Each structure stands twice: as C-alpha cells, then as structure tokens.
Amino acid sequence: MAREFSLEKTRNIGIMAHVDAGKTTTTERILYYTGKIHKIGETHEGASQMDWMEQEQERGITITSAATTAQWNNHRVNIIDTPGHVDFTIEVQRSLRVLDGAVTVLDSQSGVEPQTETVWRQATEYGVPRIVFANKMDKIGADFLYSVSTLHDRLQANAHPIQLPIGSEDDFRGIIDLIKMKAEIYTNDLGTDILEEDIPAEYLDQAQEYREKLIEAVAETDEELMMKYLEGEEITNEELKAGIRKATINVEFFPVLCGSAFKNKGVQLMLDAVIDYLPSPLDIPAIKGINPDTDAEETRPASDEEPFAALAFKIMTDPFVGRLTFFRVYSGVLQSGSYVLNTSKGKRERIGRILQMHANSRQEIDTVYSGDIAAAVGLKDTTTGDSLTDEKAKIILESINVPEPVIQLMVEPKSKADQDKMGIALQKLAEEDPTFRVETNVETGETVISGMGELHLDVLVDRMRREFKVEANVGAPQVSYRETFRASTQARGFFKRQSGGKGQFGDVWIEFTPNEEGKGFEFENAIVGGVVPREFIPAVEKGLVESMANGVLAGYPMVDVKAKLYDGSYHDVDSSETAFKIAASLSLKEAAKSAQPAILEPMMLVTITVPEENLGDVMGHVTARRGRVDGMEAHGNSQIVRAYVPLAEMFGYATVLRSASQGRGTFMMVFDHYEDVPKSVQEEIIKKNKGED
C-alpha cells in the first residue's frame, strides 16, 4: 500500500495537562471534528472514547496513553492522550519521548497547576515544541489573561496569545484571531456553525494591543522580522505565521489559544494551529543513536529510504489480540510478517500483525512508514524503551528515563488458587509499566509492589482483580526509603577459609565516596599491577551491587555511592569469584563504620489550595509534618501554599485537610527529591526494621 500522507503532512502530537483540565474531552472533540466518531462521549458520563479501560471510565481520569490517528485539512494527526495525574508520570514521559509536538491544556480558571509544571518540565527536557490551549472558558471564574500570566510566572515560558476570547463564563461566545484580525462567532452548541466577522468594536483596542505584543515577541526570535519591525515596516500575516512556526519548532515561543472543548468552541482553530505551528517529522533534528558494533554515534533522518529504526514506547495487554507493542517509526518502512532486530536486547523479533489504533478499536495495516505510530502483535522480548531496527543497520536509540518508585505495598493472595494467578498478573502489569516493581522478600516470602503513588498502586491492584480475576489482601502503604554514605572512607574486605575442602581467599581495598544525587552507584577499577586479577574484578562489583540492595543501616537499597577498587591480594589456588564477592561485601560493611551512613526519604512537592480563613491551619499542618513552606500566592478567595513535605508524613492527609476546611480544600503532591531523614526519625526507622518496639 502506497504512503497515504507525506511526511510534511504528518503530525505526531501529545495532549498533556494537569488532571481535570479537560484533556480527554479535548481529544474527544478532535476525534469528533476529524470524523473519527459520530457521537461525542462526555468524560463525566463515563462514555469517553479515549478512556477505554473500565477503571478510567469509573474514575473519570485517564490512566494509560491511548494512541489514535485522525485526519485534518489533508494532514494525518497521530494523537496520544496522556494522563494528568502525577502517579502516572511514566505514561507522560514515554509519550513525550516519541512525539514531535504537544498541546498543553490548561483550565482557564486555575492556569498552570502542579502537574502542568511537571509535564512542562518533562517536555522541556525532551525538547518538545508546544502550543497551549486555555480550556474551560465557559467555566465560572475563567480568566484567559490570568492563565497566560501563570505561564510566565510559574513556568518562565515565552508564551503569548494568538487568540483572545469574546466573553467568558456563560457569555463565552467567540474567539478573536490575532493573526487574521477577525472574530469567529459560534452560533450553535456543536461548534459546527461558525461566522467569521469583523472584531466587535468593544474588543478592537484590546485586540490591537495584543497583536502588537505578539508581533514584538515573535520578532525577537527572528532577525529579519526584527529589522522590519524596528524600521516600522508592516509584517504580513504570512510572515507572522512563518515566524510563529519557526520559533515554536525551535522551542523559543509558545502560542496560546483559548476555547471550551465541552461547549465545542475553539477546537477546530486549535487543530489548525497544530497543523500551522507544530512540527512534522522533517522539521525536527534526525534521531541519534549508538551503533552497537562500533560504539559510534549515528543518525537516522526521517525518510522512507533510510534503514528501518523504531522505538517501542508502550506495552499493553489487549483482551482480544494479546500483547501489543506500541512503537514510533523514525526511519524506513516496516511490513507485517517481517523480522526486526531488538538492538537493546540483541534479539531477533518477528512482527506478526501491525495495527493502527483508535483508542481501543483497531485497524489492521500491512505497512508502516517513517513518522508513523502503530502497534505490533507478536513481539516476545521487547519492553518499553527498546530499539527495533533493520537487521543489517543496527542502532540503539536513546531510551526512556524511568523514575524510581516512592511507595510500596504488601500484597498477598486470598487463596492458594490465587497464588499462581497473582504471579502471572503482576508480571504482566510490570511489563506494561516500568515504574511498577514487584519483589519478593526472601526472608518472609511476602510479595511487595512499588509504584509512584497510592492511586497508581490502587489502580494496579484493581486491574489485577478485574482483568486477571485475582483476589488479594493489600497491606498499608510503606515509604520506599534509600540509604547512602555521607563521608568518604577506605575499607578492607578480607575473606579467607582454608579448613576442609577447597579453600577460599579474597582480599580487597575499596575507597567509598558519596556520589551526586540521582547518579546512583558507580564502580571504578583502579587496580595496577594485577594485585587483583582481571577476571575477579566483575565479581567485586557484583558483590557490592548485591550487598547494596540491602543497606547497612536498615536494609534499604543504597544509592549515590562511588566505589573505587584500588588494592588487594589473591591466592593462586584458593581465590575465586565467590571469595571476591564476599570480600567486597565485607568491605562495604567495614566502610559503614566510618562513612556516616544515612537514610534518605522521598520529599514531595505539595500544593495545597484552601479558603483564606484556613491558611493558618495549613501552615500548621506543614510544620507538624516536618515540612517547609516554599511559597504562597493568593488566587481569588483562595490561598495556594507550596511546600516540601516527607511522603511518610502525608498518608491520610486528605482526611485531615477535608475536615479542617469543611471539604473546600484540595491538595496535589508530586515526588521531588530524596533527602536525609532527621537523626531521631532515622533511629525509629532502624529500630522498627530490627523488630524492636
């Protein structure tokens, strides 16, 4: 089958936002206007097309990124709807990794909210161009210009309106296009009848002022436009649009649009902006990767003529076709039935069928081309972040950063029959979601699951029950602590056993130093003269890695430590890998005596919104929970408090806040960083873990 849409006419976009900003409804409207669905599904009725999991429809939130393809103005738009809840950050991250552009949806009443900051930061990290859609203009308290100001104040974004609303709240009836300088007036509730008129007289001054600001902001990103602007020459609409497109693609400028997806206003104009200002696969730099045979960096430009290269960004279990692997094709062409190489795992995979997804319905296709997003059936070894390439032109593309889980729960099957089913279910769920970890406590045999938050684990336990029919008892949530060293030290690990049978001999000197936060464990071999033979070096590193899985203070994993093996000795006959592994672990234990070991706890960035009169209560809550206030701002009659609070102190806070504010207060929290626990708390944790009361 020949290519239907050229690369220039392809857009791969994500829709991202804070929970409840109206993201899924916006995607629904896009599908409605592009002819994909005939009836609009409302999220609050539990009938949305993109939210296809049972739980999503019940909870009215989006959990998995559904991928769908639509057509607009002779362009193909592949859309990924991402979750806005902080517990599902990995879904946002893996989507951003394979997108070329994104639409950030704001709630016009609240502007930038905590999770907006998180997804914005992630999009900046991946260099994703964005346009902003200020949604819910029909809502009480909607304020477009306030929303724009929050983009400047909270995100330091060079964001400027390319539209202005006509009216707001119940009176929201149209949109001013600042490029054409025309007004779009909506005459019905389906948003299909739109009249283009001159700008109403009472809005003309404001429109001229904001067009001037827009021209100035765009001119600052382009030398030619700047010269014309300074010389007082007129900048044409075409030049202005070209300037906005160039600056947006270079991530120097963010156009802001307005509308109400629920009331069907502004969505078509937003689709026009996706085509006009967001990049095609040809507009962004060619993807880079490493050739596994030569270790040299190579690029893969977006072209059907190049060798095939794709990135798997999501695994999903479909009730009808089994395991689905979603992938983005960066270069080349792939046909169903062909073989590819998974360069991340070094394994050959056969592509059974290729499906193009529309939320949860699917269409089988024979061929995918560069720039496409599709799902494959039949891949056995491929997981999130793996590269799939032509067998003759290997390349490993940059993978996806997976955040560490911060919360854990104990789960146990209710009956013996559930035992095996639970193992299979947890394994499948962990394949789909890299931030979900499953471990078995060797001593107690208990199964511990870890994830990004209470809702995250809730949803997974719920899915285990619904999809895999496993009934399980769930323990109280526990915090995922970490351990580290705060001082440098040198320590010897000496292991010798020479009585009866084969002897054992291992002797190492290791220097331990604290590593930068987030850098993890780093091992350096500084042995000279072969005092520890080369074949035993990996055993020393392995011995340290295994010992660090159970830290020296309370058995939590150790992080951010550098270990330099610089001296030691061996025995010609008795030395073995096992002996050096044990010696390395003894060296770590010895180091703990002088390296100031510390326990680290996850600190959450908590944003609490309460009525003015409850501000004092909230400040008290933060202090009582070992937190520190980072900032406050007034918004209408509410106060917004930002604070850093240990996760351990936040369990059950929803109930406390609800009763203190008579149900009017809300809070959001997102993991921010790890920090040393105070000495008194550390002693309690150690006691508890040693089984003392």
UniProtKB/Swiss-Prot annotation:
GO terms of molecular function: GTP binding; GTPase activity; translation elongation factor activity
UniProt key word Repeat: no
Ranges for domain tr-type G: 8-282
GO BP field: ribosome disassembly
Keyword field: Cytoplasm, Elongation factor, GTP-binding, Nucleotide-binding, Protein biosynthesis
Pfam hit, one: EFG_C
Gene3D superfamilies on file: 3.30.230.10, 3.30.70.240, Elongation Factor G (Translational Gtpase), domain 3 (3.30.70.870), P-loop containing nucleotide triphosphate hydrolases (3.40.50.300), Translation factors (2.40.30.10)
UniProt-annotated location(s): Cytoplasm
Highest taxon, organism lineage: Bacteria
InterPro entries: EF-G-like_DII (IPR053905), EFG_II (IPR041095), EFG_III (IPR009022), EFG_III/V (IPR035647), EFG_IV (IPR047872), EFG_V (IPR035649), EFG_V-like (IPR000640), G_TR_CS (IPR031157)
Residues annotated to bind GTP: 17-24, 81-85, 135-138
GO cellular component, one term: cytoplasm
UniProt-listed SMART domains: EFG_C (SM00838), EFG_IV (SM00889)
UniProt xrefs under PANTHER family: RIBOSOME-RELEASING FACTOR 2, MITOCHONDRIAL (PTHR43261:SF1), TRANSLATION ELONGATION FACTOR G-RELATED (PTHR43261)
Family: Belongs to the TRAFAC class translation factor GTPase superfamily. Classic translation factor GTPase family. EF-G/EF-2 subfamily.
HAMAP family reported in the protein's UniProt record: EF_G_EF_2_B
Primary role: Catalyzes the GTP-dependent ribosomal translocation step during translation elongation. During this step, the ribosome changes from the pre-translocational (PRE) to the post-translocational (POST) state as the newly formed A-site-bound peptidyl-tRNA and P-site-bound deacylated tRNA move to the P and E sites, respectively. Catalyzes the coordinated movement of the two tRNA molecules, the mRNA and conformational changes in the ribosome.
Official protein name in the record: Elongation factor G
